[in-house]
């Protein structure tokens, strides 16, 4: 992918990233990362804590210089047009960064003035955002008195005041309850329907399932990039000659120990009251049940299972952990 050439001919692409590298002294935080984000997409950027997600966002928004590689955001080179990039995008940080001692209305007005919005446009935008984000009942409430979910709605509203077509959201639902998370995602889908592009970092797999495109970064390296459906079909996730099954049991710890010692089971992970296991497809499920029962492990059900995104990322993580350990040996 050649950014300078391609970006001129593919106007529907909001972000190009090519061979991004970021080093801090001897430590490489981002190592040869390339991807693209199409306009109107909700692009999920996943990875464990410390994997480089926030560093990539800071590089793409011009807040952190690139050590190597190149990137364009909304058609602008982040190396040479960082200020213009920041004028065209919205950014919502991982932590609530608005003013606790200002009301909802005062926060919106303050950030609108930071964006130098004319008074008439600011009034219009505040009215639109209050209606869209449901902030009307809270206009006179101090930000400090809002629940986590409403704080995030306010932060999103402030990031949208200048009508950006691209929004970077760094773990926007961290620390808020499941209902508020779902409501915030419903709002993102509504905004996406109006042509707004979202670059969202998250470590919630149910949120990743809702993205139109997903990339997974692990210790600075991009190890998966595609639609949720295409990632489920990766050979690394379910190689030929294997079957993924769910073993439902009240004794998940013992069942996991059994699975990891069984030569016919390639991998196994606990998911609630069940085990997700990748087995050789010649392994008869009735025989598997009998082996578990012989070990004194009660089994409620064993059934074939389509891989979830969580299965995908667990398998990819195991593989790359093994590669890292082998390279250090």
Tell where the protein language model's regions lie, with residue ranges:
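Catalytic Walker B motif of ABC-type/P-loop ATPase nucleotide-binding domains
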Residues: 167-170
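Conserved ABC ATPase signature
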Residues: 142-146
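Conserved catalytic motifs of ABC-family nucleotide-binding domains
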Residues: 163
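ABC transporter nucleotide-binding domain
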Residues: 186-279
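Conserved ABC transporter NBD signature motif
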Residues: 69-77, 85
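Conserved ABC ATPase "signature" region
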Residues: 109, 113, 120-138
């Amino acid at each position: 992918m050649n950014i300078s050439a391609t970006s001129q001919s593919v106007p529907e692409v909001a972000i190009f990233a090519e061979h991004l590298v970021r080093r801090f002294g001897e430590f490489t935080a981002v190592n040869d990362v390339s991807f693209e984000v199409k306009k109107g997409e909700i692009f999920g950027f996943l990875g464990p804590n410390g994997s480089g997600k926030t560093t990539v966002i800071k590089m793409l928004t011009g807040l952190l210089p690139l050590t190597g590689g190149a990137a364009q955001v909304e058609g602008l080179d982040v190396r040479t047009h960082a200020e213009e990039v920041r004028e065209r995008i919205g950014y919502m940080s991982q932590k609530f960064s608005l003013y606790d001692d200002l009301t909802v209305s005062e926060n919106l007005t303050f950030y609108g003035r930071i964006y130098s919005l004319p008074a008439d446009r600011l009034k219009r935008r505040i009215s639109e955002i209050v209606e869209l984000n449901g902030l009307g009942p809270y206009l006179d409430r101090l930000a400090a008195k809002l629940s986590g979910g409403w704080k995030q709605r306010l932060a999103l509203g402030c990031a949208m005041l200048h009508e950006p077509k691209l929004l970077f959201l760094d773990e926007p639902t961290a620390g808020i309850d499941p209902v508020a998370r779902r409501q915030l995602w419903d709002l993102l889908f509504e905004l996406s329907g109006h042509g707004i592009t979202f670059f969202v970092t998250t470590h919630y797999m149910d949120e990743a399932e809702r993205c139109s495109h997903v990339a997974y970064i692990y210790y600075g390296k991009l190890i998966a990039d595609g639609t949720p459906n295409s990632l489920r079909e990766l050979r690394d996730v379910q190689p030929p000659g294997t079957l993924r099954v769910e073993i439902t049991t009240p004794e998940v710890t013992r069942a996991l120990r059994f699975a990891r010692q069984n030569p016919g089971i390639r991998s196994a992970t606990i998911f609630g009251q069940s085990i997700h296991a990748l087995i050789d497809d010649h392994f008869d499920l009735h025989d598997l049940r009998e082996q578990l029962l012989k070990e004194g492990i009660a089994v409620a059900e064993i059934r074939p299972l389509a891989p979830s995104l969580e299965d995908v990322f667990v398998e990819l993580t195991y593989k790359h952990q093994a590669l890292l350990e082998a390279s250090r040996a």
